[in-house]
Amino acid sequence: MTYNIILAKSALELIPEEIKNKIRKSRVYKYDILDSNYHYKAMEKLKDKEMRGRPDIIHISLLNILDSPINHEKKLNIYIHTYDDKVLKINPETRLPRNYFRFLGVMEKVLKGERNHLIKMEEKTLEDLLNEINAKKIAIMTKTGKLTHPKLLKEYDTFIIGGFPYGKLKINKEKVFGDIKEISIYNKGLMAWTVCGIICYSLSF
């Protein structure tokens, strides 16, 4: 069986036009990708600022996913759905840079529309993506969901993990054909990359 793993509403985006004039590039950070560590002041009045500007979450999560046994067995479809409704389909054989800044360089090119044979980008909503991949049993990972033992994760074919630091993932369930359940794998909140690791490990064995 092949599973789908989606980092949703991910805090990975180009610097929004409305704050571009407030940001100056430096020797340390020369990328056009929003990062709250470097753009905190410019983001003060940005809508949903608490959810945005954390590409490091996506970087670490992808490193965990790509190096998992289930991915090496080619039984995983990997998607990044971004805050501004772009979807990146990650080829399972992608060798992602381990260096954060090199990762930003790759993602900046992809988000600007440069062709990459391992990372394909399209514009679509999360709901459209779920219907397109024919997701039937969908698990939204949330700390307030039904506590579920990791060994039961194989009952689902699609897993949605919030790719942002704070806030709640909103999804219009009426627009999704598949059955959606909110579940939790621990009684406290976990970082996205930890959740990704647990899911991938549980599906591998």
From Swiss-Prot:
The EC number of this protein is 2.1.1.-
- A Gene Ontology molecular function term of the record: protein homodimerization activity
Where does the entry annotate site (Interaction with substrate rRNA)?
A: R54, R95, R98, R102
- What is this protein's function? Methyltransferase involved in ribosomal biogenesis. Specifically catalyzes the N1-methylation of pseudouridine at position 914 (Psi914) in 16S rRNA. Is not able to methylate uridine at this position.
The chemistry this enzyme catalyses reads: pseudouridine(914) in M. jannaschii 16S rRNA + S-adenosyl-L-methionine = N(1)-methylpseudouridine(914) in M. jannaschii 16S rRNA + S-adenosyl-L-homocysteine + H(+)
Taken from the record, one Pfam family name reads: EMG1
Looking at the UniProt record, the site noted as Stabilizes Arg-54 sits at D56
Tell me what organism the protein belongs to.
Methanocaldococcus jannaschii (strain ATCC 43067 / DSM 2661 / JAL-1 / JCM 10045 / NBRC 100440)
Q: What is the lineage of its organism?
A: Archaea, Methanobacteriati, Methanobacteriota, Methanomada group, Methanococci
Q: Which InterPro entries match?
A: Alpha/beta_knot_MTases, Rbsml_bgen_MeTrfase_EMG1/NEP1, Ribosome_NEP1_arc, tRNA_m1G_MTases_N
Record-given protein name: Ribosomal RNA small subunit methyltransferase Nep1
Q: Write out the entry's keywords from A to Z.
A: Methyltransferase, Ribosome biogenesis, RNA-binding, rRNA processing, rRNA-binding, S-adenosyl-L-methionine, Transferase
